[in-house]
Amino acid sequence: MQGAFTDNTNNTGSEKETNVVIVRYGELALKSPGVRNWYEKILMKNIAAMLDSKNIPYSLMRREWGRIFIETTDPRAAGAAADVFGVVSTSSALITKPELDSAAETCAFLGKKIIQEGESFAIRARRSGNHSFSSADIGRACGDAVWNMLESEGKHPKVNLGSPDREIFVEMRQNLAYVYLETVKGVGGLPLGTQGKMVVLMSGGLDSPVAAWLMMKRGVMIIPVYCNTSPYAENAAKERAYDCIRQLQTWASGHQFTTYEIPHGPNLRSFIEMCDRKNTCLLCKRMMYREAYEIMKKEGASGIITGSSLGQVASQTAANMHAEIYQLAIPIYHPLIAFDKSEIIDIARKIGTYDISTRSAGSCTAVPERPEVKANYDLIVLEEKRLDIENMVSEALKAAKVLKL
């Protein structure tokens, strides 16, 4: 069932309680009113697309100040919404009237279901809007209701505000109150699509998918580019890269990637045959940047993303990374520049690309035995003068494939 959007609710809570997912967001709330309104609308569309992609039904999606509410009975909804960029946390909750008695009754109902003999509990209450009672009043009323319910069940209630076995949360707003038991941590960041588009050089290894995901988390829609280095790489390398792109697509419901495959083998052959072998990797990367830059302009994007991490491999020295962009007026983003390998692996596991990226796909046979690690910038430019760089870029792009994976 497709849901509907509304900006507020006039529901007074007079109906039977229904299940709802509370969606919280972070830095969106710091934006100016106009920008915030725009971000929230995009976030709601992205959440709706994520729910639809997982066949999770909802009857209504609405927003109030600082919150988005999804009315649904599907237990998967909170987890799905938490995986949408821009969402800080979610909670599956019960709706009730914004009154002490109603909130207390709902807390007692949930407490009866979850609190076992010998377990301690605490009520965590907060409120917004105009009410004749304080958050402390909510806590006392709801705590008393749970205590009395437990005693009526023959249990021995215990309150522990510091480290309880069970917690019941109450969020009292102007028109409705919400009672819930847990919070699902979201991915955070900004809604996908709010920060334009960027090209990402996608190799299929551990690093580039993580770099792409981190920029998606900051609201950037990615355009994956795979430079096919065949015959210097196995076909398994291409399949691995494509599978990583497909996995990243699951984080971008409602946003279809446009993927480019560029034949890069002929250019590599030229570098090997006509230039100093130690510079092959540097020349290769500079060519990839040029090719990606042309796609960036074609797609109306505003930057190029790489998976480079300073010092991680011999070729990723500060000098080499400078040489890779020397005299190239191209905006390059390195989101992993200061990450340890262990941190990159942790994120890869989280986003679902680790098992793909660690599949055996062979190594690039064009890599020299002793690659340059401290490049001479001007020498690299002189190396390129031996080649018809402009024509090499043009021919590669003419043969590029445009894919919807």
Curated annotation (Swiss-Prot):
One of its GO terms (molecular function) is tRNA-uracil-4 sulfurtransferase activity. It comes from the Archaea. It catalyses: [ThiI sulfur-carrier protein]-S-sulfanyl-L-cysteine + a uridine in tRNA + 2 reduced [2Fe-2S]-[ferredoxin] + ATP + H(+) = [ThiI sulfur-carrier protein]-L-cysteine + a 4-thiouridine in tRNA + 2 oxidized [2Fe-2S]-[ferredoxin] + AMP + diphosphate; [ThiS sulfur-carrier protein]-C-terminal Gly-Gly-AMP + S-sulfanyl-L-cysteinyl-[cysteine desulfurase] + AH2 = [ThiS sulfur-carrier protein]-C-terminal-Gly-aminoethanethioate + L-cysteinyl-[cysteine desulfurase] + A + AMP + 2 H(+). CDD domains: PPase_ThiI, THUMP_ThiI. Keywords: ATP-binding, Cytoplasm, Nucleotide-binding, RNA-binding, Thiamine biosynthesis, Transferase, tRNA-binding. ATP binds at L201, M202, K285, G307, Q316. GO terms for cellular component: cytosol. It is an enzyme of class 2 (transferase). One of its GO terms (biological process) is thiamine biosynthetic process. Disulfide bonds: none annotated. Its EC number is 2.8.1.4. Belongs to the ThiI family. Catalyzes the ATP-dependent transfer of a sulfur to tRNA to produce 4-thiouridine in position 8 of tRNAs, which functions as a near-UV photosensor. Also catalyzes the transfer of sulfur to the sulfur carrier protein ThiS, forming ThiS-thiocarboxylate. This is a step in the synthesis of thiazole, in the thiamine biosynthesis pathway. The sulfur is donated as persulfide by IscS. NCBIfam families: tRNA uracil 4-sulfurtransferase ThiI (TIGR00342). This is Probable tRNA sulfurtransferase. It comes from Methanosarcina mazei (strain ATCC BAA-159 / DSM 3647 / Goe1 / Go1 / JCM 11833 / OCM 88).
